[in-house]
Amino acid sequence: MTEQQAIEALHALPRLPRSGASLERMQALLDHLGNPEKQFKCIHIAGTNGKGTLAAMTSSILTHAGYKTGLTISPYVLNFRERFQINGQMMSPRTLASLTRKVLDAADAIIAEGGEGPVEFEAVTAIAFLWFARQKCDFAVVETGLGGRYDATNVIPAPLVAAITRIGMDHTEILGDTLAEIAAEKAGIIKEGCAVVNYPEQPAEAMGPILGAAAETNTVIITPEMDDIRLLR
């Protein structure tokens, strides 16, 4: 399998699942792959605006601090392999082809057993997690694709940090048609045992579900003051 064949095979997978929103397909896929999602520490990022920027900055900080840091983002800008990075370097074409073959073989095994195969984003996320585990990353910075609660990335155990960027109206046909409903889905990445960092100027309507998720999981929300945030050059 070549890089182009791998990309075409991934794009040929369904975009939406037959059985609706669930983490069961993703968990089944990772179980077949040896559960790579349990082999690295994670910073999980959800929200509407600024996810990609925050993910890139967090990855850069950890890399410059001397940690081997994976990064998976969605979507990419110019090159499909932008979605898979370690210490700022994209996955090689050969590795993409090899890991795509492994993930698709696992998907075929699930289907042969009578299960439902993964959608494209689930397969892509599995490739990222498998690579991070094989490369023994210290950390992985993981950006959600859509929402949070049922996003394929949310199969990870409790992250070290769950970061919520600014919540806005997006994907209303899937996440809900109010800020509160959308925030509730994004806040689904908050798990017991993690730290939660919240955007300083979060809309009031979004705060209720975020505070509720923190209370349910016994986590503390850290909300920096906007005046305390500055870029170091």
Regions found by a protein language model. Name each.
Residues 45-48, 52, 69, 125, ...:
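Buried hydrophobic positions in well-ordered alpha/beta secondary-structure cores of metabolic enzymes
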Residues 23, 27-38, 64-157, 173-175:
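ATP-dependent carboxylate-amine ligase catalytic core
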Residues 50, 91, 147, 170, ...:
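Glycine-/small-residue-rich active-site loops that bind phosphorylated ligands and cofactors
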Residues 110-112, 135-144, 159-233:
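Acidic, Mg2+-coordinating active-site environments of NTP-dependent enzymes
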Residues 1-49, 53-68, 77-79, 136, ...:
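N-terminal leader/targeting and accessory segments in enzymes
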Residues 28, 57-60, 95-98, 102, ...:
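Alpha-helical scaffold segments in soluble metabolic enzymes
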Residues 1-20, 88, 142-146, 162-174:
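N-terminal-biased segments
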